[in-house]
Every structure is written in C-alpha cells, then in structure tokens.
Amino acid sequence: MAYDHHEIDKKWQRYWAEHNEFNTTTDPKKPNYYALDMFPYPSGQGLHVGHPEGYTATDIVARMKRMQGFNVLHPMGWDAFGLPAEQYALNTGHNPKTFTKQNIETFKRQINSLGFSYDWNREINTTDPNYYKWTQWIFEQLYKHGLAYEAEVPVNWSPDLGTVVANEEVIDGKTERGGFPVVRKPMRQWMLKITAYAEKLLTDLDDLDWPESIKQMQRNWIGKSTGAQITFRVTDSHEPFDVFTTRPDTLFGATYVVMAPEHELVQKITTPAQQAVVDAYIDEAAHKSDLDRTALDKEKTGVWTGAYATNPVNGEKLPIWISDYVLASYGTGAIMSVPAHDDRDYAFAKKFGIEIKPVIEGGNVDEAAYTGDGVHINSGFLDGLNEHDAIDRMIKWLEDKGIGSAKINYKLRDWVFSRQRYWGEPIPVIHWEDGETTLVPEDELPLTLPEEADIKPSGTGESPLANLTDWVNVVDKNGRKGKRETNTMPQWAGSSWYFLRFVDPHNKEALADYDKLKAWMPVDLYIGGAEHAVLHLLYARFWNLFLYDIGAIPNKEPFQRLFNQGMILGDNHEKMSKSKGNVVNPDDVVDEYGADTLRLYEMFMGPLDAGIAWSTKGLAGARKFLDRVWSAFIDDEGKLRDRITTINDGRLDKVYNETVKKVTEDYDALHFNTAISQMMVFINSARKDDDLPLEYVEGFVKMLAPIAPHLMEEIWSRLGHDHSLTYAPWPSYDESKIKTDTYDMMIQVNGKLRGSITADVNESDDEIKQAALANDNVQKFTAGKDIKKIIVVPRKIVNIVAK
C-alpha cells in the first residue's frame, strides 16, 4: 500500500521546526563534524533539481554523524550580492534588495520542503550589513598589510553592463551572462595581491583531500614556471626590454621576438610603414578576453612592427612581432621565440615564413618542432651539453654579463577586486582632496549601501553610487573634503569567508570567536559544483591563509575534504535550461512523489560525481521502493505488521549485518547509490521472511532515515518511539555474523572455466579436489582423460590439467 507523502512530509517538517531539531549541539564530550554546501545565489528561478543533489549528499552525512554521536554543524545561507539581481532591478525598476529578499524566501521554502537538516539559527546573508561589516573589515586588514592596492590595469569593460567583468566571465569576446560585447581598456581598479600567496597556495594543496583533477586545475591556474629573465635591446634605439623563458638554453635558436599588443614599447618602435596594420591589430585584440587570446587550439595571428631586437648571445637581428597570444600581464609581456623547439612558435614561424634554427639534436624541424631532450648544437659554448646542464651554464653566463638571471614566474595574476555596480559591498575607503587615501575607521563599520539608489550605471565607468552626491561627499573634522570610493566589491567577496561566519554568526566583536573556530574548522566535508574549481576555492583559500597569517583564525586551510557533484541533465541528455524547455522544478516532483522520493532518486541515479540524465521512470522506481519499505513494516490499516517480533531466528543475521557495514562505509565514501542497492537487498530478504526481528527493523529505519527522513520518522514513531530519530544511535554490525561457513570456487579444466562448487571452510584440499572432479559439467571435459595435476588456489579456483 502507498503512503500519503503530503501528510507525512508536512507533519515531520513541522515537528523538526517546532523542536529546533537541527540546532547545532556543542557537547564538549562529543567530536565535532562540519558539513557544508556551497551556499547558493538566490536567483529568480528558484531551486532546480540540480541543487538538491549536493544538498542531499551533505544532509545524509550530517544526519548519520548526529546518530554516530557527533556535534554536527550543518548550516545554510545566501550568496546574495551580484550582477543578476542588479540587472533584473534595472530591467524592472525594482530595488535589488526587495527582489533578493523574495528570492531567498522562495529558496528557503523549497529547501525546507525537501527536509534538509539545516540549523536555520545560523542562516547568513552576504547582503546583511551585520555580515558585510566583517567582509569590509577583512578588506581593511588586507589594505593595512599591503595586499589591497589601486592600479591602472587593462580590464574587460562591458559598455552594455556598464561594468568590468572578470576574465573568467568572458566567452568569445562576450559576457557570460547576457552575451554583451566586451572591450579591453585601462581603468583604475582595486586589486588584491593574491600573487603574494602563490607559492603557499600551491604547496598547501598537497595536504588536502580533494579530487586530483581540481587540485591540478588550481596548480595550472597558479602556473608556476622556473626559468630565466633575459634583457634584449631594440636594434636601432637600444631600448631595453625583458623576456621570461623556461628554456634559456635555447637562446641561440631564437629567430624572432613577440610582444603583447599592449606592450609599452610597441608604439615607440613601430615603423611608419607598419603603423596602420599594427594599430588595426591592437584594436582587434582589445575585443578579446585573455582566455580567448591564450586558447591553445586557436589559430595564431600577428603582425610585424618593422623593428628588430638584438639577440644578446650572438648579436643576430630578430624581427619584433606583436601577437595577441602574448599577454602584457603575464611575465614581461614579451617572449623570445625558438620555433625549432616549441610547438606554438613553430606554427607561428611556419605561417609567417620566419627562420627555424635547430639548437638541440633530434627530430626533423622540416616536419615539426623537436621538444624532447638532446645534445645542444649550433649553440657555441653550450654545444654537447644536455638540457639541464645547458640551462645552468646559460644562466651563469647571463648573470656574469649582467643581462639576465634565474627567475620563477607565476601565471596567477592579482585579483581585480572592484566592480562599477551598486549591488555589492561598499569598499570602505575615502579619497581626500589632498591626494591621501584612508580607510573608514573600524568602529564606523559597516559602511552601508544607501537604500534608495538610482542604480543605473553612471556611463562614465564609475559605479551608480557616484550619482549619490550626499553619500559620496564627506568632510573631516578639519574641513578637508573627500569622496567615498564608489566601486563595490565583486560577488566573490562574501563567499570567500562565509564558512568562518557560520561557526559564530551572531558575534558582534569579531568575524568569529577564535576558540569556536578552533573547535569547528576546517570544514570536514564541502560539496558543490566543479564550476567553482578555480575561482571561489582559490579566493577562499587565499583569504583563509591571510587571516591565519595575521592571527585572526587558527587554521590555514578552509576545506579539508571537497567533493564535486555531477550535473543532472535534462531527459534529452542536454544541460537543463529554460530555452530548451527541459528544466524540472523540484516543487512539482515533491507534490507528485514526495520529498523522500526526490532525495532517494537523486542519490540512486548513479555515482555522485557523474553527469546523468533525469528520468521520470527512475523517479517512479524510487517511489515504488519506498512504498515497498512502508508495506514491509506497516499493514493496510496503518498498523505495525504482526511479523515484527522480539524473537530473532537468525535467518536475517547475515544480510542485516552486511547491510549495516556496507551502508555505513558507503555513506562515509559518498557512494550513496550502492548503499541504496544494499538496502534493497535487505528489504527483498525481509519481505520473504515470516518473522522480522524488531532490532533489525529499527536498524534499517535508522539507515534509510538520512536519505528518506520523513517516511522513516513516521515508521519510527509507529514502532512506539515518542522522540525523533535524529539522535537515535547509529546501528552497529557484528563481523562474525557476516563471515560465512561456505564459499564458492570456480573450476577450470585445461585453462577454461567449466563449473563451480560450494566449499565448506573446514574442507581439506583433497576434499575440494574430489568435489571438483565430481561436478557434472567438469566430468564432460575430463571423461576418458588422464588427470595430470589438480591445483587448488585457496578460496578462489580449482585448476585441473587433463590429457
């Protein structure tokens, strides 16, 4: 018989809320466990079925850990600043604050309808001044330590959005959100010196329990390179410029130089004959993001400036080109090109007919660049040396001549930390008329966002806050006039430290109490989408390391264990989107099938990190299993089945203990699909048995409760319990009940599988051999033959050799 999910879901959600069931306990005798989801941006669309996948996973672990005797911190909040709310407000004339508040209410209602065990007393919202007071405080500490500074930097400017967007938010020369065109232009921006932490961010990765693919993405993003910086000179003007190379040993093979289109020397050295093509190329490059420019698979483009550089090692003249694959912001903005031994340089040289000169033996440079090691040739004092020795010798030569030195370079660049928008944290800085810049005093934080704002972009590149003269203009006690900083922080700011605030969300004196942080941090389990692999996780690690260095927090790393859930695709195997009409609303699923069915189905679809297509058939199957669980224990009158008894005849011992062991291990490993499979095995066995031991029924209910909490609470109460099973002790298993007295063995005859036998643990090898020879199928292949040899591989296989 089917259960009534509408009634049961609401009943237990009400019970949990009224009893503050999931408030974080702080029993000093218990160990602590911190399970965290990447908190969502509350969009206007509300939850889609992709959100609950990660949320259900952390909820299962949080619920199990409570039952295992842990204090569990499992909070939820809102990453609510950001462009989408502001764009909506601009399009509709509504204030983003109102819109965001409504969205949060929708998200919270939907989350609660799914029965997640969040401690709502710790709810945080990045747009709450009581929260962003501490975001501003962190900015002020960064500024005091020289890690926040202003600079003129080339940025991705979107005229339509009226703001700067990050490199990662530009795709094919357009903004990721909205598809608006982007141009590169220099602007005054606030920067955070994340590069100061490049080495720490790199080395500390080794100690984290993170997917190797994510760690590798961070390593690549930081992009550490060891090599040399070499000074070249423009041939006629003798203007010096530096290049960075990881292969200084190939300097004799350099046949041209490439500068970034933005390099400061380009306009100085371009000849009149080349000026027009150079200007056109520079303009074209300004419309591309750094990511587009450096894509490995893109065709190389470039133009010659008409100028030459002198190779410092042999005096040869090298043509100076510009190409957009060289970035002004990486290294020195200029590279030496050795086409014989670099694939990208080779493709460029072939395309533009530039000389290719081999300096390492091996390969055929008429066909391809040779990038392997080998003996140096055509290289003067390096001839006959291998790569390692030649690099050392060349660096010594450069240092002796004063024209170069060993250098470590990072691809990582400082973080552009300002946005020309209204809906973000105000940057607590005042620019005074005498040129001084000061911070807003700490005791005046938070510097709040003015409520009634004309939030249209100013059009000048400044934030809409620039229009609010009453807010912008300030006078100090000595009559000195100043203007507030009108740029706001990016959406990444609030999410770079929120995991710390959850530990102590109501603290008015500090971002969080040091001892409480010591008790809870780092986060034990952090689950979210792989799309945050680089930025959010890198920024959060940077802020955490900085706060650790200044003694504000006790832990270096924020997230000990990270897991990325896969993407739930539409039933047509494409990404869910409104335009494709394949979005599934969780409200509809909960209404038709119940919250527990949605939770169970999403965990049973496949491995948690796999991308899997949504299936209504699979959803119906999940519901059918829950109905089978219900009817295994509850009769048609809604009463406990008579066969639930305190007597245990031992017939379910093995399957029950196997189930407890497997489910416990699988929950810890986040292998929820296989845990569910094992629970299905138990239910199938239980339904066939005349007597169900009460202990095993209760143990099973506890095991399924983290996945299907509403239905299991209902069965638990009908088993006679007057308290919730939130803190009911997790079941244990008896290893001796899992061990069996028999095991299966395969039988091979002359190397081919011909049958199997069931052997007793006490049987001797001779008895096993006799049983194998007596097998009906084996006898077909041994009849009339001499048995030359029988080999018993214990507990695995019997090999019979017959001639």
UniProtKB/Swiss-Prot annotation:
Record-linked NCBIfam families: leuS_bact
InterPro entries membership: aa-tRNA-synth_I_CS, aa-tRNA-synth_Ia, Leu-tRNA-ligase, Leu_tRNA-synth_edit, M/V/L/I-tRNA-synth_anticd-bd, Methionyl/Leucyl_tRNA_Synth, Rossmann-like_a/b/a_fold, tRNAsynth_Ia_anticodon-bd
Family: Belongs to the class-I aminoacyl-tRNA synthetase family.
UniProt-listed SUPFAM superfamilies: Anticodon-binding domain of a subclass of class I aminoacyl-tRNA synthetases, Nucleotidylyl transferase, ValRS/IleRS/LeuRS editing domain
Chief place where the protein resides: cytoplasm
GO process annotations (BP): leucyl-tRNA aminoacylation
Extent of motif 'HIGH' region: 40-51
Biological classification of the source: Bacteria, Bacillati, Bacillota, Bacilli, Lactobacillales
Record's protein name: Leucine--tRNA ligase
The species this protein was found in: Lacticaseibacillus paracasei (strain ATCC 334 / BCRC 17002 / CCUG 31169 / CIP 107868 / KCTC 3260 / NRRL B-441)
CDD domains: Anticodon_Ia_Leu_BEm, LeuRS_core
Disulphide bridges, residue numbers: none
